[in-house]
C-alpha cells in the first residue's frame, strides 16, 4: 500500500503559470485520503525473488506480469487522468554472469517524458475506483525514435513503474493548472532485456502466462526455429510421397507384365485359363474336358481341316492355332478311337449339324495377338486328334501355297459368325462345297458305319466298299 504522504507531488507547470501552483484544486487533492495498491502482489514477489526481467523490442513488447492497480479516496465527481511511466531504479548498468546479475558500470541517461496515458482518461473518480486500473496495453521498446506512445528503455538497466493521477483542469478556468499525485512501486522493479537471461524467469512466465505459447517447448519461440521445423516436416512428407510413388510404379509395371503374359498366351478366354473351376461353365471348353457331354450330336459333327500354309491373311496366326490344339487333354489325344493322317484342303466331309446360337466373347476378353477377334472354335473341340495329326499339320508342303483355297475350316466359320450381329445366326450358312468344283469333290462313307473302326483319311489306296451316290448330298 502506497500512502499519499510519501508519494504526493506537483505536476510541473509552464513557467508562465508557476504563480498559481497553490490553488484550490491542489488543496482539494491533497486533502483526499488517496490510496493506491498493486494487484497480484504474490506473483510479483515470486519474480522479484529471482530477479524480474522484461523484454523490450523495436516494435514494443507488453509486460508480464502487467501493472494493475486499485485506487481509493478520489472525488467521485471530479475527472482524473491516469498516466504511467518507468523511472530508473538506481544508477547502475547490469550484466548476467552465469546464474546472477552483476553491476556493470554506470547507467545511461534516462529518456524523460515517455508516458503511457490510460485509454479511459479522463474519467470521473467514481469510474477509476469502481474497478482495478489495468495497464496491460503498455508496451516497452528500445527504439528511441518511436513516437507511438511506447515507453522507451535502455537494455540491461533496472526500472520501476510509476503512476500519476492528474486532476483535470476546470473547463471554466483552462489556464488554471491541475494538481497530481505520484506513486512508485519498488516491488515491481525489473531489468530490461532483449532476451531472457535467467531460465527460471522463462519457466515462471510460461507457468503463469496463458498467452506465452511462443515460449513453450524448451523456449524455441523464435520464427527461425518454427520455420526450420516446418520445413523439415515438409521435406519428410515429400520424401515419403516420392517413395510411395516409386513403389506404386514398380508394382504397376510388374502387374502390366503379368497381364501381358496372360493375355497373349492363347486365344482361350483368360478367365477360363486362370480359373480351372469355371471351365465347365463355357459350352465350348466343356467339350475339351468332357467329350461325352456332346451326346447324340457327335454323329452329325463336321470334320474340316485345311493346311496352315493356305490360310488367308485375315486368318489367325499359326502360333494361336498351335496353342489351341495344345490345350487338348493329353489323355484324350492318346486314347482316341480314331486317328487321322495328313488331310488335303479338298478332302472334306459335311453332314447336317444342329444350329446352335452362339455369342462371341466380350471384346475386352479376346486375345490381342489375333488380327481378327474370333471366339473359341466350337467344332474343333469335338475332334479327337492324335499327335501324328498335329505334326502333319505343322509339316504341310509349301506347294499348297501355289493353289490357295478359300478358308473353309473351323476358324473361317468362327470369323463368319463373329461378323454377324450378336445373338443372330444366318439360317443357311455357305457350305464348303459351294467353293469346290464337281470334279474336285470327294465322297466319304457315312460316319455312323465306322464309329467303332479306325481308318485314315486322305489315303489314296484306301478301299471304300460302300460309296453313296452324289445325289444324297
Curated annotation (Swiss-Prot):
GO terms for cellular component: chromatin; nucleus. One of its GO terms (molecular function) is RNA polymerase II cis-regulatory region sequence-specific DNA binding. Exclusively expressed by ventral mesendoderm. It is found in: Nucleus. InterPro entries: p53-like_TF_DNA-bd_sf, T-box_DNA-bd, T-box_sf, TF_T-box, TF_T-box_CS. Keywords: DNA-binding, Nucleus, Transcription, Transcription regulation. Its main location: nucleus. Residues 43-217 bind DNA. Residues 342-361 are annotated as: Disordered. GO terms for biological process: cell fate specification; paraxial mesoderm formation; positive regulation of DNA-templated transcription; regulation of transcription by RNA polymerase II; somite development. PANTHER family: T-BOX PROTEIN-RELATED, T-BOX TRANSCRIPTION FACTOR TBX6L. Probable transcriptional regulator involved in developmental processes. This is T-box transcription factor TBX6L. The lineage of its organism: Eukaryota, Metazoa, Chordata, Craniata, Vertebrata.
